[in-house]
């Protein structure tokens, strides 16, 4: 029944399928399988539409279907703003246009099956670099990509997007040939293969087919899935040479009492100081109204650090009091405090839209901290860095050294957004092959250790302590992504498209005539043994060969 509707009313059926599949695929936490199915429908639909009458009207109908599905998938989120419906509608309009544009562009770029995956991955790489929310909103899977997650340290999310585009290309070709019945194949005069089918108006359409590229693309997808079965994403063993266990804590006190937030965080930090080496406060844990309040609070944190030997990540919100265009705005920051005072300061580089906060322009740095216990007189150093909130939605790889631990204070307004941001942090940890201490301070937030095989998660408030393993000294094994960024992924994606287009010079190599072949001695001997001996003619007396 469904196939008959598709054959007799293909455009209407495709619009309905587009709306339903976009709702399932463009959820706040996109999964790979629904996204591939939705993208294959969109790829097939746009390829059939662009060569027919009323192309623009048909594309507007497709965009409307995507917008409806995208809007209802995000309608429950608040985005940290009271103008929730307006923000949701704006998000749906922008990203539905961005996604549809690149699919339509690929439909006009010919029949090379490698073009669409390359365009798809490159497009979302550019959007992530330009968007104020990074990869939030990108049509890219956040879950369900474990089979190809080993690619992320080498080509980042660019490789996962290429896998999604290639899978959608293969699936759309399979549906076109074997489900919809557009598989009447003939040979052109030049020997190339073509496929004939009729459109809705009854006009015969001829489309070139190259099933060899599709099969090769399918072979690449299958081959790239094998390495995941050979690797295990597990934490490092605790008791091995050159490894030390480090206690990390996310401080999430109960703020319903009469105490101020700063005192509550200080008391909770003192409770876990005997078990943790590093304690992190969530994003905007305290508010410093003046510079004097900030200095006083950091001095108290330094005294606590000196007393217990713990490093404290104090996350705060402060107003900008300097004269200028940013006066009156705020900024989020995290200060790493040790026994000797402030060791490093980090400020949010990508604040949430409509939050009226000032972004930091400089990249996060790395600080070396000395860990150990006084009673054992055994100390070691560990490299540490930090980023705040939406910074983890933006890929970054340019560190002078590999950090062994990244502090990740955050604060989200919805359970789904908490899951999204924690998955973003997991992707950044996989790219850098490091561990992130994720600490979300909202009532419905998630916190835990992500990366390096860690899977600990906690929902809502409640201070916790977890042990992680650090290699001492750290192994400086730089990945391709850390060395070259997205360049290696771009090279691999576009090489099958660009290389066949390069004209090669007509070079003819002339070889000298080969030497005369030596006699086949074995063959001659075999002939001599098998031939019959000559006999003498009795009449003439001569030898005769028989």
Question: Where are the model-predicted features located?
Answer:
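A short, polar/charged loop-to-alpha-helix boundary motif
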Residues: 350-363, 459-475
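Soluble catalytic regions of membrane-associated enzymes that act on cell-envelope
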Residues: 209, 226-357, 372-378, 390
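Structural detector of well-ordered beta-strand residues that form the stable sheet scaffold
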Residues: 311-313, 385, 437
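Short beta-strand scaffold segments in enzyme catalytic cores
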Residues: 314-316, 332-336, 365, 443-452, ...
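Residue-level detector of high-confidence beta-strand sites
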Residues: 342-348, 408, 455-461
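Membrane-embedded alpha-helical bundles of multi-pass enzymes
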Residues: 2-233, 414-415, 425-428, 432, ...
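Active-site beta-loop-alpha substructure in enzyme catalytic cores
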Residues: 124, 266-280, 358-432
């Amino acid at each position: 029944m469904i196939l008959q509707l598709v054959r007799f009313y293909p455009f209407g059926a495709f619009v309905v399928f587009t709306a339903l599949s976009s709702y399932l695929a463009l959820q706040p936490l996109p999964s790979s399988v629904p996204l591939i199915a939705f993208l294959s429908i969109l790829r097939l639909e746009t390829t059939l539409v662009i060569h027919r009458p009323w192309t623009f009207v048909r594309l507007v109908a497709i965009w409307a279907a995507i917008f409806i599905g995208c809007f209802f998938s995000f309608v429950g989120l608040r985005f940290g703003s009271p103008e929730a419906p307006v923000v949701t509608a704006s998000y749906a309009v922008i990203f539905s246009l961005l996604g549809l544009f690149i699919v339509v562009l690929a439909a006009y770029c010919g029949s090379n099956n490698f073009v669409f995956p390359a365009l798809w991955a490159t497009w979302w790489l550019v959007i992530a670099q330009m968007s104020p929310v990074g990869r939030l909103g990108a049509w890219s899977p956040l879950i369900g990509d474990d089979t190809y997650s080993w690619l992320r340290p080498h080509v980042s999310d660019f490789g996962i997007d290429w896998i999604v585009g290639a899978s959608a290309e293969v699936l759309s070709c399979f549906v076109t040939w074997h489900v919809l019945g557009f598989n009447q194949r003939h040979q052109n005069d030049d020997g190339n293969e073509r496929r004939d089918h009729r459109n809705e108006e009854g006009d015969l359409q001829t489309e070139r087919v190259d099933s060899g590229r599709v099969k090769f693309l399918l072979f690449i997808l299958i081959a790239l899935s094998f390495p995941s079965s050979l690797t295990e994403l597990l934490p490092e063993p605790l008791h091995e040479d050159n490894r030390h266990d480090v206690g990390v804590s996310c401080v999430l006190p109960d703020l319903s009492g009469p105490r101020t937030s700063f005192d509550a965080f200080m008391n909770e930090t003192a409770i876990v100081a005997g078990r943790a080496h590093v304690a992190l406060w969530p994003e905007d844990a305290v508010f410093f109204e003046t510079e004097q309040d900030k200095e006083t609070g950091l001095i108290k944190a330094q005294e606590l650090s000196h007393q217990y030997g713990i490093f404290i990540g104090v996350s705060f919100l402060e107003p900008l009091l300097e004269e200028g265009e940013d006066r009156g705005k705020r900024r989020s920051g995290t200060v790493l405090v040790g026994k000797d005072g402030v060791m490093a300061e980090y400020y949010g580089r990508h604040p949430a839209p409509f939050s009226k906060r000032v972004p930091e322009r400089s990249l996060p740095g790395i600080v070396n901290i000395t860990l150990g216990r006084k009673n054992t007189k055994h100390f070691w150093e560990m490299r540490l860095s930090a980023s705040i909130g939406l910074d983890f939605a933006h890929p970054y790889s340019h560190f002078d050294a590999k950090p062994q631990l990244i502090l990740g204070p955050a604060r989200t307004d919805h359970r789904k957004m908490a899951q999204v941001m924690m998955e973003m942090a997991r992707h950044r940890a996989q790219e850098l092959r490091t561990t992130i201490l994720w600490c979300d301070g909202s009532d419905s937030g998630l916190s835990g250790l992500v990366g390096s095989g860690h899977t600990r998660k906690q929902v809502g408030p409640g201070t916790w302590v977890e042990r992680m393993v650090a290699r001492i000294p750290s192994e400086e094994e730089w990945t391709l992504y850390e060395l070259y960024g997205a360049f290696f992924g771009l090279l691999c994606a576009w090489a099958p498209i660009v290389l066949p287009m390069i004209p090669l010079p007509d070079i003819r190599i002339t070889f000298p005539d080969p030497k005369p072949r030596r006699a086949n001695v074995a063959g001659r001997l075999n002939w001599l043994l098998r031939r019959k001996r000559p006999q003498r003619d009795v009449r003439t007396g001569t030898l005769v060969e028989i």
